[in-house]
């Protein structure tokens, strides 16, 4: 059975990391994703790289550094996201630790926002427990 005819639950390929920034991405993987672009996310704690199919190159990264996590933090965060029109995240870490620091991070397409970024950032800055808000464009 050739690799092209196998239709199981996963597909794997060994990648070689060289001095340059290029990685050979198999055509069969690209075809399976159904798009010619993707969002690559490195999850530090797991040392795991995930790739998500994209319709557009427009992606924003949102990071919240959390000092003290309250019981209703995620409920309030969800309400802020809903008011801002942020209902379809490309990827979210949930609340996670990196060393002794606590974060919530996500990636999203900015076209879904029903409010501007300034309003979203202001709402997040006053959320109990949030020490720092970072919103930035993800580079191609």
Language-model regions: role of each:
Residues 1-32:
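Charge-rich, low-complexity segments
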């Amino acid at each position: 059975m050739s690799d092209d005819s196998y239709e199981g639950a996963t597909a794997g390929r060994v990648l070689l990391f060289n001095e340059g920034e290029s990685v050979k991405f198999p055509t069969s993987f690209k075809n399976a994703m159904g798009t010619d672009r993707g969002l690559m996310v490195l999850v530090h704690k797991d040392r795991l790289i995930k790739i998500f199919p994209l319709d557009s190159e427009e992606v924003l990264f949102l990071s919240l550094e959390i000092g003290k996590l309250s019981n209703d933090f995620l409920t309030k965060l969800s309400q802020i996201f809903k008011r801002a029109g942020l209902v379809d995240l490309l990827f979210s870490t949930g609340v996670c630790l990196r060393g002794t620091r606590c974060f919530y991070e996500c990636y999203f397409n900015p076209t879904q926002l029903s409010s501007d970024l300034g309003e979203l950032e202001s709402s997040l800055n006053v959320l109990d427990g949030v020490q720092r808000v970072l919103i930035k464009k993800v580079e191609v």
